Amino acid sequence: MFALKKNEGFDRLLKMIGEQNEKNVDRSEEIEKILNSLKLTMKAWKTDTGIYSIIKYDKTALGLTQDDYASIGLLRSVVVDESGKIVSYSPPKSLNITAERETQFNLNNIMSPIGDDNTNEWDAEEFVEGTMINLFYSEKGNSWEVATKSTVGGNVTFFSPKNPKDTVEIREKDTFRNMFFETCKKVGVNYEEFPKEFMYSFVLQHPKNRIVLPITEEKIYITGLYTINQDTLEVNQLNRAGFIKNYCANAVLTPKPLFSVDYTVAGFKKEFASMNSPYNLMGVVFNNMITGERMKVRNPNYELVKNAKGTENKMMLQYLSLRHGGRVAEYLKSFPEYKTDYSVYRNSVHAFTKNLHQNYLDCFVFKKKPFAEFPQQYKKYMIQLNKKYIEELRENRNCVTFNYVMEFVNKIEPGALLFSLNYVVREHKTVIQRLEEPIEKVIDTATDTVEVKATTEETATATATDEPTPIEKEKEKEKEKQE
């Protein structure tokens, strides 16, 4: 249950909105004062079903802290009608995973494949890519209405058309509103049968609204289902599975549940949100089934592809070149406006270094899986590290430590390092290009790729097998003692 009155003055704000609209009393000054004090924004929208206001927390507000999100984060996207009544509610903002919250995760209180909703406090599910569409019933308009996070009516598009001449046509045909209702019809969702007192939050996937993933078919996921007590302003979260079973089985999807080997946050991150995770995993979302709290971890590879731009490569190469020469701090003294961007690039290099070291250990020391199964962008350097171990470190009984890998990465030529850091971006572009190619061309290209990949991995595997196992190392030490 979400207590919206936790935001002191929010109930008064709703009352002021109602008085201004229905009694024609000017409350704009008082409304603005409450919005500012609560760090909220509000925008009015007029549709065929009525006049609405979307209230959201202001991400740009001065002095906004993570602690504030526990209260104003409940107001991520709230739609109010002209009487001040809440008609639509979206899932609240996800909270940061703090050290205290991280201790809550273990096999005893997070859903496992054999877990029970009644005995586990948390569950983990895939972070679904798409556009949030909230559905609610308008009593005044006597029909169903939709809202996105920032608009009511959904008569907007996300991507601008490449051809300006197509603007009007595309806005009319490919709005979020049209795509949502067309998808409902295609997958067999009869929303006219839905309970009108519920507020619904969905994620829409549509081929015409591609964000990162190569979406080829329309899908609708339900992420939130709510009722509200208009007097107490308490929002109740309802069971999604039960709703689907009764009203839209085989039509509306729920995010896929995720399971980890050790059921810790670190375990989930490693499997679903690390530099080793494929870019087509957006991340993982943790849901508290008692309080309704949400926490999420984003996959850095997904974010890398999402934020990739033409000018981004030039800036990143510039950073890597300065870093290679030890001149980053000096450069930022003259151009401090690049500090934020450079921090992002630095974190990418650090994550790459950490994963390269772990992949080396998992492959050549712990033998967790075959060399061929490791991410392509690390293989070249894993082989080089193994070679250095054999030729330089083994004789002195030294091993490949994290500091050794850090120094190794610092010496990689900037262009080569950029190539590896951007591997998932190029992989994504290839997938998208193939979606748009004729099928005959895709088959020919795929055949050539398989042949080249097979040859490359055979060579790489042959090199990799030169690395001794831990048992072989112990035998070697015993042999040296005997001599």
What are the functions of these language-model segments?
Residues 1-483:
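Core nucleotide-handling region used for phosphoryl-transfer chemistry
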